[in-house]
Amino acid sequence: MKIGVIGGGSIGLLISAYLSDGHEVTIYVRRQEQKQVINEYGIRLAHQREPLSVSALLTEELAKEDCLFICVKQFQVANITPLFNKHQSPIIFLQNGMGHVDLLRDIQAQVFLGIVEHGARKINDHTVAHTGKGGIRIASYNGDRSLLEMMVSKWDRPDFPIELEDDWLSMLGKKLVVNAVINPLTALFGVPNGDIITNPYISTIALELCREAADVLGLDFSEQWNHVKEIASNTKENMSSMWKDIEEGRQTENEAISGYLLHHANHDIPFTQFAYNSIKALRLKKELMD
């Protein structure tokens, strides 16, 4: 298959690397420098010596693909949606949070939604470390289920599993709970994901964040708390994307995660409010220091 991956961050690089085995993968990036280095050196998984053959183009050079994986941050989706009606390839969105769902109505192509449970760390423009083995889950938003089944059968592999889900809303909700717990806490305390369960003081806060998120989304708390702990354990050495965004002075997905819960809550959720305000404060502090 001809697969396009939009986004040259850690997840975009990881997906491009694994799917390049048996498929023709093109990664679409924002910067000319990254395009050049990938075309020259390929993409390398940090635990492997040999680079993998992947082509790179700039995002505005989007060509016809058999399918597209959208791996940009939540707040970047709106900027690229006008490109999607050009070729109408089936599209798989892999964002944190749920705010991007409101942007999908005007897309004429078949749309699928997914979540990523892997840990990944971008080392440089063409190298990514696979820091936590998990999986990718995909459900249909308005796309043909049989088409999705066919595509997943071609992509799924033991070391990079891709699974089908029936209910996209429940799937995204469960991932939002995980993000609402792990992302702000790891960013605030500067710790890897595993500390969510190994540090008893952080774990106490994590439990309350999970309780609030599950309540807002109408999900079972005990089930979600077990899921959060499982993800934190599987990606225990990973530093969350929010921590990396804070460290590098980039915009975070705070609005799409904690902000989404605050907007949809019908009562006070104090732990989530604290997490939201704290990430805002941390980013402002970083900006002033820089």
Q: Language-model segments: which ranges?
A:
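Helix-loop-beta segment of a Rossmann-like dinucleotide-binding subdomain
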Residues: 88, 127-137, 190-196, 238-248
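NAD(P)+-binding Rossmann beta1-loop-alpha1 motif at the extreme N-terminus of oxidoreductases
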Residues: 1-51
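Alpha-helix C-terminal capping segments
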Residues: 16-21, 57-63, 80-88, 101-108, ...
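NAD(P)-dependent Rossmann-like dehydrogenase/reductase catalytic/cofactor-binding core
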Residues: 207, 211-290
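Hydrophobic anchor at the start of a short beta-strand
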Residues: 3, 23-26, 91, 111-112, ...
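Rossmann-fold dinucleotide-binding core
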Residues: 94-171
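Rossmann-like NAD(P)(H) cofactor-binding subdomain of soluble oxidoreductases
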Residues: 44-127
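Active-site-proximal catalytic alpha-helix in oxidoreductases
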Residues: 169-214
